[in-house]
Amino acid sequence: MLTFVGLGLYDAGDISVKGLEAVRASDAVFLEYYTSRLMGTTIEDLVRAYGKEVIVLARADVEQHPEPILDAAAAGDVVVLTGGDPMVSTTHMDLRLRAAARGIPTGIIHGASIQTAVCGLTGLQNYRFGKSCSVPFPQKNWFPLTPYEVVRQNLAADLHTLVYLDIQQDRYMRVGEAIDLLEEMAVRVGGSITTYIGVARAGSVSPVVRAGTADHLRGIDFGGPLHVLIVPATLHPVEQEYLEVFAGLSV
């Protein structure tokens, strides 16, 4: 059997009781650690906390060469650990489909996701979010405008946008960098963004949540990763009050 277990948002303590039971009862534990990471812990901490050896997967291990995972799941009970909630990533959906194609039973044990955590941290109503997008680090001769197009379409529909920030092997995009990139995108297509909300280290005991203009947020030290960004649409009075109280929004 192949069971996907969400680890939650920040550290080894975020796993559910049900998830921990599945890990400890398994024959093999794999960790997919490139679509999201827990910044409040280390792999060594996970091994100690869960009492099991953990095999760390590279992107190619999941997307191109998943046979060792599937072979192990065909022979016994295998757990694949993921940051956040497992099926938010299409990578995990594909692996589950591959398992089903081989007749391997699968299951999901959910974990806390940034998609819902931002609602509690910012007070934005969850049903008012549109399509999310990701801002990548630009490369030579490559500066995609798609993230801003998603934001613009959502704003036109009066919907908030959750913006994921790029994660690389040794580099994590920060709120200020993402704002600079979105502002450049907006200039190139003749648009603008009035308000941003930056969130850092959701799930930790000291998350940072700040709302305001691009210039205001550029001057704030959000601290260590992971960071995400929200571009809000028109605010409901309760949303606005929440942001004023808990994110320092000035009106």
UniProtKB/Swiss-Prot annotation:
Binding positions (S-adenosyl-L-methionine): 9, 85, 88, 113-114, 165, 202, 227
Chaperone in keyword set: no
InterPro entries listed in its UniProt record: 4pyrrol_Mease (IPR000878), 4pyrrol_Methylase_sf (IPR035996), 4pyrrole_Mease_sub1 (IPR014777), 4pyrrole_Mease_sub2 (IPR014776), Dphthn_synthase (IPR004551)
This protein's record includes keyword Ribosomal protein: no
Keyword annotations: Methyltransferase, S-adenosyl-L-methionine, Transferase
Gene3D superfamilies, per database record: Cobalt-precorrin-4 Transmethylase, Domain 1, Methyltransferase, Cobalt-precorrin-4 Transmethylase, Domain 2
Pathway: Protein modification; peptidyl-diphthamide biosynthesis
GO MF annotations in UniProt: diphthine synthase activity
Catalysed reactions listed for this entry: 2-[(3S)-amino-3-carboxypropyl]-L-histidyl-[translation elongation factor 2] + 3 S-adenosyl-L-methionine = diphthine-[translation elongation factor 2] + 3 S-adenosyl-L-homocysteine + 3 H(+)
Listed EC numbers: 2.1.1.98
GO biological process, one term: protein histidyl modification to diphthamide
Entry function: S-adenosyl-L-methionine-dependent methyltransferase that catalyzes the trimethylation of the amino group of the modified target histidine residue in translation elongation factor 2 (EF-2), to form an intermediate called diphthine. The three successive methylation reactions represent the second step of diphthamide biosynthesis.
Subunit comment: Homodimer.
Family label: Belongs to the diphthine synthase family.
Name of protein: Diphthine synthase
Source species: Methanosphaerula palustris (strain ATCC BAA-1556 / DSM 19958 / E1-9c)
